Every structure is written in structure tokens, then in C-alpha cells.
Amino acid sequence: MTVVLFATEYDTPNIVVNMLSETPTEHHLFPLMIKYKPSNRIEFVLQTQRCPDSTRVRPVFICDARRLSLSEYVSTNTPLPARVICAGIDADATRELYEHLFDRKKDETGHDEENGSAARHLFSNLTSTLKCLVHYNRSAILRYLNNTFLSPTFPSWFLSTYGTHEGTLILTMSYYLFERTYSTIQTTRDYTKCFTADPGRNLFTYINMRDFMATMNGSRFRKQTVLFAVFAKARNARDRCELEYVDAKINAFREESRLAADSCVYYVYLAYRTALCREKFLQYCEHTAYDKNLPDDQQCAAEENYLGRSLDAELISIMNTYFSVEGYFGSYIHVDRAKLSPPHSYRGYDWNTEADTMVGYSSTATNLAISLRKLNSTCESLFSPLPPTLMGLLKLCASDRYVPRAEKSRKRTSGGREKEDETRVCRRNYLLNDTSRPIGPMPVFRVEMPEKRHVFCAVSAENWTRRLLPKDLMKNLPSEYVSDECLTDAVWLREDIAALCEVGEQLYRTRHEMFNENLPVFNFVGDVDLKLREDLQGLSRQEVFDLCRALRRTLIGAWRHLFPEVDPDSHPVFFFKSACPQNAAGAADEAMLYGGGGYDEDDDPRPEHAAAMVDYGDAVRRPPFCVCRRKLGLRVIIPFPPRTAAIGAQTLKRLAGILDHTLCLDRDLVCKLNAISHPGECFDTGIYSHGRSIRMPLMYKLDEASGLILHSRLNPIFIVPAGYRDRPAEFVLQQLCPQNLTHHGRPPQRDGSADQLTEVVLHITDRACADSDGNFLQSRARRAMSSGRLPLGPLLRAHLSLESGQSAPSLPTLVGRGGGGEGGASSDYEEERAVGSDEEEDDDDVENLQAFARRIAWPALLRHTRNHYREEVQQQLEAATVFTAVGRTCVAVKRGLYGRARDFSCLARETYTRQETVQVFLDIRGDQRRNVWATLWSRCFTRRCNSNAKQTHLSLKISLPSQY
């Protein structure tokens, strides 16, 4: 059959209905695209609004070629009159197109009655003709045509949709409309560029459809439609193979690695950007362009998997290096260590944990301020004042400031004269009211008390062993190592159920160590949380211990790469597991030890013989060892090598990030983790900030509902290294020693000299992460997104100069956008900043940022907000006078009131109490088109605004004045 795509200059559905009802008007039909095939059937088609199964045209009527001389009109570029079409319509074939719309009613009986049957039959024949059916169902047919088909009446629609060049227009229309393939118009237009270098003349907008029809029917590209269809299908198949290969490469790496959800998004973005960037895709188009010297079956076959191989070379290979142990530590991790020569002031806790009596200080936050003010007054002439806050207490407990004090000893020399000894005192002596000896740095603990109260304690001496460990601990420990499980079972700790109001007692139930950035860190204390899968029905004893052993193997391997002097067979890694919830199902037997207690044999509902059988192997199915549901909480502690400590919170945060990434590099560990938990960062880095606290091992949580019940104790799990297998009791004592369980405690097994520290870790750098707060994928994505941007400083200077009437300074050239360019070799990551990114801010940049926000960005935002915000909000915004830079691209905005800077009330919602606690910011960034984007956002502390979550209100583009 022959298919004719036509158009009209008026309402096409009405013209078609008039022809079907044999009441043609004087309108004409313009055949634009014809697909010939020897047949007596000519289908006149229109483009559909929807294309199920890639069917993009459907017939609206069918003509008989014996009654319609189509070639006569086409050869002379003459439009088809409606009356000629009407005479050539095949009524039977056309009727089938609209059969579903015709309303053909019958009697309820389903057959003709005897009386009047002949008349009924005659009437049925007269009304069942196409003419009559269209007449009686005109509204339904018009509705169908309007809802199903596109019926443009101007040539400009075809030019804007399919292309303005002659070749692009005809080849795209013929392939997209007549070839049922999965392709879009834009993709087909791109195929035409690869098919021919000469797309023909540029077609201007035609005034009438007749000239447009003549141009299309007389084009030389009509002869190339068949050849182009063959090429486009081959190219389409090649594109599909390329994308499937790229998808397979991306998914293969994603499935092998344990990427968190946000990291996975960054990875997918980077992968597709690398493989399908503009430069790579243009090169791919050159390799798959039409070659007239090749046969049709060899078109688009050169260099298979071109995009996938570029992805391998420019991203996957780098990812494989970064996600392998040797490549990661060998190419990306650098540890900056410094030697110390005595005397130096780096000291850990001077903390006696085996004293007969407790020496310390405890206070609430309110009383702490009073005590520190009193201490400042007492030591005013000796020491600089401390801030009367918790930060002041931390500074006091870490201070190395001493003053000499002369006192006479009671012993006399051989000459009978008294001998004067020089002793030293510090502010800690005054705080503890003890001047008998110099008191060194002390730990500061936060203790949770009943009724949601907190007490802060500074402890110099206590008896940890007597208060927390059983008296017969050494008697119950085996002399020979059997297994980690047996050794863990041999240690039974005393259980507590309820909290007490005495601080001295509660200190041994809910103690939290506070991180003190003024002290060196001797032990890496890791807070590990594994988000468990919802379908997990508990973990067996074997699974929990195997997981801990795998964690030790992976972490000690990373420790060995960071500190080569570490012996992996003897260096300890201490594990503590948070006890399971008390109401978890199936908590019994040995799970009671780790389920927080609460088990009573008298309350066991099982028969006596069944309960007795629990201890006999596999006689009955044991309940799970761990019945945690939401997360599995672990405390993992790794001491630094002897005579080595780390300095600074950022060092600990980066170290936690490195260990977190290391967990993704061990295939065996990844399999274990994926089976029980969701991917994501395991180590909490928020605990390594000055003044933040972390619950110590052997301590409980306090129930929020009651404020009295203790639960989720951190119980020990002993994973004995090979070097301690001959003396397991010594390892147990080390794991229960408090000096090994705190950030700043000095392990007692090292030599007892005061200045034992000989080396400190200053920085640990991941060369792939220029931003210390971001990971590898985030840093790479930021560099990819910032490529092509102008530096913000020169851009702001240009805006300010033009705003003040001066000539704008010359702007630096734009950096080209490349796909592989953002990350070719691994050496690219050694640069801290990408070319073209913002430089380090100086005073001029800060002043320019504040001036731009005050003089240009804020007035532009005010003009926009007048029509979109409430009057009281607008009044607040117009009162803003203080603009302070808080980052390279961020400005804090405050109102000026009576000479003071004030925050705002809520900008998004009306609140009952209009508290002025909302922080407002202006984010200012440039783009590659030399525009500046100003974004207004705020943080509101109310729950209705998601408790301090970032709320973006509006973004505004500010162009250079010369572009207005």
C-alpha cells in the first residue's frame, strides 16, 4: 500500500469529516511525505499524539488508487481537492477505521420481529452506509480526531519540530514517522548529521502550505530516505549496544563495591558524564558516521564499545585503584608524622584507675560556671582566666600551665638545716582542692542522670576495677585459649537495672568521655553503626563473631599500611557490642547476656525438659545470639602504635573516613556486611569534635520514656590476636582496662616514663579528596560540576565595577568542559583545586562578596520578593543591613536594630510566637555564562520547619549590566 502524510491549511478534522460524509468543501489536501508501495490501497495518515509501540502515524481515510490518480497531482505539485478525494474514498476500508465509534443499536430480543421485518431491513441498509454513519456520529468522530492526531496547519510547525534544513527535515520525518523504531525526533535529527555532511539549504518559514509541499516533493533527499533508514537502524542498534555495555560496566562496579546511597548517586553521575560527555560523544559520532565506501551491513561497526572503553580508561580504572587496598594506600593516603624530642608538653590522662579513694570534681552546667568564675578569681594573678563554660573545663583539664611553689620538707640535711623542695601546682589543684602533688591532665565525663539531667565530672583518681569488674575475674578466665566465643562466655559482668541519683554511682553506669582537642589521642575509638536489613531475623553467635573477626582482619590491615611498625599478629583491636533491646523477640539463653538481662527461669514458658535441653548442642534450635532490629551498634577501639599519638580532630575524622572506606575493599567482609546491613558509612565522625562525647564501653543507655531503666550496655566481645593466644587472660585485662578505652588515655603496658611520646601524627591526607569533609566521589563530582565556571572573585569585581560606572576588568577565559578531563590519571587528584575553581579567599574577595550582596544582590531580591511574600516578611527583609561573609560563597544576613544585629522570624510560616531566631543566608555563585546566581535560604529552629533544616526560598540570576 501507499502511505501519504498530508496536511491542510484549515481545520483538518472538520475537513476529513466533511469528506467522509460526502459533503466536501473547497479546501485542499497537501501531500508532504509519500511512501510508495505497489497497491490499489492509498492510506492518508496523520501524526498521532501518542506513539504506542513506536506507531507514530495512523490512517484517517483510505482511497482506491483506481479512482484517485495520486501521481498526477504529485508530479505537478498540485494539492488534492477535497472533492477529488471524496470521490476516491474506499468506504468499506475507511469504515473499519471508525467502527468502534458507530452506535449500532439492536432490539433487546436480538432479532427482527415478523411484522415490519422487511421495512426494518431496508432502513438498516440505508443507514449503515459510511455517509450516514458519519453524519449521525459526527461529534464522536471529531472528538476522536482531535484527541488522537496532530493536525498542524502551518509549515513553521514542521520546521521547528523536525529541522530547518532541507535534508534534516525530510530524512527525519521519513524515518521517525514511517519506520517503527525506538527513537526520538532529536536523536533522528542527530543521525542525519552523521549521515550527510551537507544537510541542504536552510528553509525559511513558508507563508503557505503549497510552496512547502513543492519543496518537500521536489527535494533531492527524497531518494536517500531508504538508505538513511538502513543507516539509522544500524546506528540505533549500535547506540543500544554501546549504552548496554556502559550500563553493564557501571553496574558491575556498583555491585562489587559497598557504596552508600548518596555515593552511589555521585558514582552514577560521574560514570555517565565521563562516558557520554560532549567531547567523547562527538568522537563516537565520527567513528559511527556514514561511510559510502562500506556496504550497508558494515555501517556503524568500527571500534566496538568505544564509549565503554573510554569509561574503563578514565574512570573505572581509577575507581579500581581507589577501591583496592594496595592502590588506595599506595597512591592516595599520606600520613604526616613528626618526631618529638623531650621535653615536650604532649601528655595523656594523668588518671589513676586503681586508687583507694576517688578524687574528682562534678557539677551541673550551671554550677560549673559558678565554680570556674570563682577559680578565675582565686588564680587571677597566676593564670589567665578561663571561660565559665564546659569548654573552659576542658581547657583546664588539658592545660600544661604550672606555677612553682616552694615548700619545706620535714627531713633535715646532715648539717641540720631544712631543705627546700620545688613543687608545681596548677589550676587543677585548686579545682580539686588538693595540693599534695602536681595533677596532670584529667578526663572529663558526661554522666546521664535520671529525669534527663546531665552532670560533668573531671576525675583524677578512682577504682575502676573494684566498681565494674567481678572480684573473681582472674579465677574464671581460662589459662589456655580455646576460642573467642568461649573466652567471651567466661567473662560475666555484674548487671544493673535502674539508674541512681548519686553521681558517684551513676558514673559507673552512664559515663560518656568528652573529646578534648587540646590533648593527644592515644586510642582510636570508633563508633560503628550498621543499619540492619528489615528482613533480618537475628544473627547467630557464629555470624556475630565471624563479623568481628573479619572487621579485625580488615582494620588491622589498614593500620599496618598507615603504621608499618605495627605487628598484625599482636596489635590489639577491642570490640564491644551494644546489647539487644530488652523486648526483642527470641531473646533467651546466651542472648540474655547481650540482651540486657531480664530473664528469669521461673518465667520461662517452655516445659522443663525443653528448657533443660538448651545447653545440649543442636537438640533444639537455639534462639538468635543477636536480635537487634534497627541497627547493630559496635564500639571498635584500636590503640595507636607505642610512643605514637594523633593530634587534632580533623586527623581523627579523616582516619575514620579511611577506615570506613577500607571496609569496602575486603570482598569477604563486604559479603558479610551486605548480607545483614544496608550500604552506608559505618563510622560516626561527629564524635571527633571538641566537646562531643561518646559512651564508654561497659556503660548503659538511659531509657528516655521512664528516665530510670538502663539498657543497651556495651558488652565486650574478645577477638584475640594470634600473638596473645598463649596468654588470653592478659588480653582480657587489656580490653577491660579504662586507659585503653578512652581517646586520650595512655595505655599502661607502655613504659612508664613521663615523656614516653616520641612521635605524633599531624595529618592524614586522602589525595583524592580535596575537601576534608567530602569523600572521593563527592570531591570528584564537585570538580566536574565546577569545570567551566569563572572564578567568583573576578566575576564579582566586574559586576561591582560596572555598577559603579567604571569599566569592567577583563575576565579570565572559561575552562572547557570535558568528560575525561575531570579525572584522567590519578595524579589529577593530587591538585587541591581544579583549574578555574575559586581561589583561596583573601580580604579583597571577602569585601567584594559582602559589597556585592549588599549593593547588587539584595536589592534585586527585594524587588522580586515584594510580589511573593507577606508584608511582615518584606518588612524584615528590607530592614537587613548587616552582611557578613561566612564562607567563600555564603553571606550571613542580619537586621540592624538599635545598633545591634538581630536575626529574623520565620520567613516561610506564620508562628504563634514570633521568635527572632531564624538565620538567613545569601549564597552567591557564578556560572560559565558570566552570570551570578543569588540564592536566599534560611534555617528555622521550629519543628514545623524541620528543626534547623535548610530551606531555600528563591534563586535569582544577575547578569552583567552590559547584557541587559
Curated annotation (Swiss-Prot):
Q: Give GO terms for biological process.
A: bidirectional double-stranded viral DNA replication; DNA replication
Does the keyword Iron belong to this entry?
A: no
Note down the stretches annotated as region Disordered.
807-844
**InterPro entries cross-referenced by the UniProt entry:** HSV_PRIM
Q: Name one GO molecular function term.
A: DNA-directed RNA polymerase activity
Organism, by scientific name, is: Murid herpesvirus 1 (strain Smith) (MuHV-1)
Which terms are listed as keywords in the entry? DNA replication, Host nucleus, Metal-binding, Transferase, Zinc, Zinc-finger
Q: What is its EC number?
A: 2.7.7.-
**Pfam annotation, one family:** Herpes_UL52
Q: Transmembrane residues, as ranges? A: none
**Looking at the UniProt record for this protein, which Gene Ontology cellular component terms does it annotate, in alphabetical order?**
host cell nucleus
What is this protein's record name?
DNA primase
Could you tell me the superkingdom of the organism this chain comes from? Viruses
